[in-house]
Amino acid sequence: MSITQWPTSERPREKLLREDAHILSDAELIAVIIQKGVRGCNAVELAREWLNHLGGLASLLNADFHRLSGLRGLGKAVYCKLKAAAELQRRYLRQSLERKGQLGCTQDAQQLLYAQLRHHESEVFACLFLDNRHRIIQFEKLFYGSINQASVHPREIIKRALYHNSAALIVAHNHPSGVPDPSQADRAATTHLKEALALIDVRLLDHIIIGDRNSFSFAESGLL
């Protein structure tokens, strides 16, 4: 049944206008973005089909075009709409924390870094440069590939910290496997980096590993 044949009170766009976006299901929100379905399948049904096939919203928004192109109704135009929506969410979160200024807690950093790194399908190592009041100066993605002592170059991180006149920083990388448990290489790289930064009086506040649905904090776990 076409959405236009639904009672007005049940249509996603009308529900959003009448109340707010937070009351809509994931499928309904996607339907608002894509606007139309395909023959015999309305936008909500189509979105629900994609979510069921991929295992949820995160998998849908993080997948590349090659993976999504086999789903019916998901062409280049729809893919671009979904990617744009996901990127807007990441930028909104980042700018909200930047306007807030000081990072109030580890959870603030985890929330920001999760949004920035979760969607990558290979490992990415990033730095959040902070001033002496733990206000965000800059966020940068520095290294790509397997994260270990050989691939994470303290010299480059030190150079960027000095450039930003940073007093402290938080580093993070993602685990594409979805499991955020630290490896021995993660532990060794963290220790090596902490010692290198101490030589220029820059504090390493945390190393956060981003998983599929949660994250791991070296600081919270007493490993820093």
Swiss-Prot record:
<feature type="domain" description="MPN">
    <location>
        <begin position="102"/>
        <end position="224"/>
    </location>
</feature>
<keyword id="KW-0479">Metal-binding</keyword>
<dbReference type="InterPro" id="IPR025657">
    <property type="entry name" value="RadC_JAB"/>
</dbReference>
<dbReference type="InterPro" id="IPR046778">
    <property type="entry name" value="UPF0758_N"/>
</dbReference>
<keyword id="KW-0645">Protease</keyword>
<comment type="similarity">
    <text>Belongs to the UPF0758 family.</text>
</comment>
<keyword id="KW-0862">Zinc</keyword>
<dbReference type="GO" id="GO:0008237">
    <property type="term" value="F:metallopeptidase activity"/>
</dbReference>
<feature type="binding site">
    <location>
        <position position="186"/>
    </location>
    <ligand>
        <name>Zn(2+)</name>
    </ligand>
</feature>
<keyword id="KW-0482">Metalloprotease</keyword>
<dbReference type="InterPro" id="IPR001405">
    <property type="entry name" value="UPF0758"/>
</dbReference>
<dbReference type="Pfam" id="PF04002">
    <property type="entry name" value="RadC"/>
</dbReference>
<dbReference type="GO" id="GO:0006508">
    <property type="term" value="P:proteolysis"/>
</dbReference>
<dbReference type="Pfam" id="PF20582">
    <property type="entry name" value="UPF0758_N"/>
</dbReference>
<dbReference type="InterPro" id="IPR010994">
    <property type="entry name" value="RuvA_2-like"/>
</dbReference>
<dbReference type="InterPro" id="IPR037518">
    <property type="entry name" value="MPN"/>
</dbReference>
<feature type="binding site">
    <location>
        <position position="173"/>
    </location>
    <ligand>
        <name>Zn(2+)</name>
    </ligand>
</feature>
<feature type="short sequence motif" description="JAMM motif">
    <location>
        <begin position="173"/>
        <end position="186"/>
    </location>
</feature>
<dbReference type="GO" id="GO:0046872">
    <property type="term" value="F:metal ion binding"/>
</dbReference>
<dbReference type="InterPro" id="IPR020891">
    <property type="entry name" value="UPF0758_CS"/>
</dbReference>
<feature type="binding site">
    <location>
        <position position="175"/>
    </location>
    <ligand>
        <name>Zn(2+)</name>
    </ligand>
</feature>
<keyword id="KW-0378">Hydrolase</keyword>
<protein>
    <recommendedName>
        <fullName>UPF0758 protein CBUD_1789</fullName>
    </recommendedName>
</protein>
